[in-house]
Design a protein with these regions (language model features):
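Generic structural signal for hydrophobic
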Residues: 1, 69, 113, 148, ...
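An N-terminally biased module of ancient metal coordination in phosphate/nucleic-acid-related enzymes
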Residues: 1-55, 131-145, 152, 159, ...
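Short acidic/polar active-site loop segments enriched in Thr and Asp
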Residues: 2-3, 75, 120
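Short low-complexity, flexible loop/linker segments enriched in glycine and/or proline
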Residues: 18-22, 66, 170-173, 199-203
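Helix C-cap/helix->beta junction micro-motif
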Residues: 43-45, 72, 150-151, 180
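Hydrophobic alpha-helical segments and helix pairs
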Residues: 48-92
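Long, positively charged, glycine-interspersed low-complexity recognition regions
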Residues: 173-209
Length: 209
């Protein structure tokens, strides 16, 4: 490996005393950046290290997040839309949905996030667990894919989903992406160093998607 990017779940500064269960707290972020900056400097002759975050687009708080992150030397931000609305007032994208209104809300929020120009690509764009009518799914995912193509935002085939046998990546989603003509990237989504050996996932992605 000659290039390695780190993109932990970004802190979000919510109103009140709400904290996410799956992301670092704002007060931990400086240590995150400092540790990666030190590693980047120490190993600069051996490997290129990039410092980033994975973040949702939450309309109520996104400007606040960007203002917070602007104080740090980040190289990129990935969109990973794990929740609808603003998280604390929404539902998980991994819940099961059958109603069109929920899928429409997810896609609309993602496209709105695309339009900010802040995201390098979208991780697991097919994370939304819609199990309703396939024609409804296709209609709205065409919207998502066309918006991503227009704004030159790549779509990720997520290796963690393959590795952990999750409900994504979805073949029907990437069939739509192929028809629209999207740029696609592979994301190893490694949560430990051992998961950087992703040949099995790569081979699966090349065969299945």
């Amino acid at each position: 490996i000659k290039t390695l990017g780190f993109s932990d779940h970004s802190p979000y500064i919510f109103d009140g005393d709400y904290y996410s269960h799956f992301r670092m707290r704002p007060e931990e972020f400086e240590g995150y950046v400092q540790s990666l900056t030190a590693l980047r400097d120490e190993y600069k002759k051996d490997i290129d290290i990039y410092i980033g975050v994975e973040a949702e687009y939450y309309p109520k708080y996104f400007a606040r997040l960007c203002d917070f992150l602007s104080d740090y030397p980040l190289d990129y931000m990935i969109m990973g839309q794990h929740y609808l609305c603003n998280e604390y007032d929404g539902t998980s994208s991994c819940d099961v949905y059958t109603e069109e209104k929920d899928l429409e809300r997810y896609v609309g929020q993602v496209i709105e996030g695309f339009s900010t120009g802040k995201f390098a690509y979208i991780a697991h764009p097919d994370i939304f667990r819609f199990q309703g009518d396939e024609k409804i799914y296709e209609k709205h995912m065409i919207r998502l894919c066309e918006a991503a193509k227009s704004l030159e935002i790549p779509l990720e085939i997520n290796f963690l989903g393959i590795r952990a046998s999750r409900h994504y990546p979805r073949k029907d989603f990437f069939r739509i992406a192929a028809e629209v003509g999207n740029n696609v990237i592979f994301g190893c989504d490694a949560h430990s160093p051992t998961e950087l050996d992703y040949k099995k996932e790569f081979d699966c992605a090349m065969k299945e998607y």
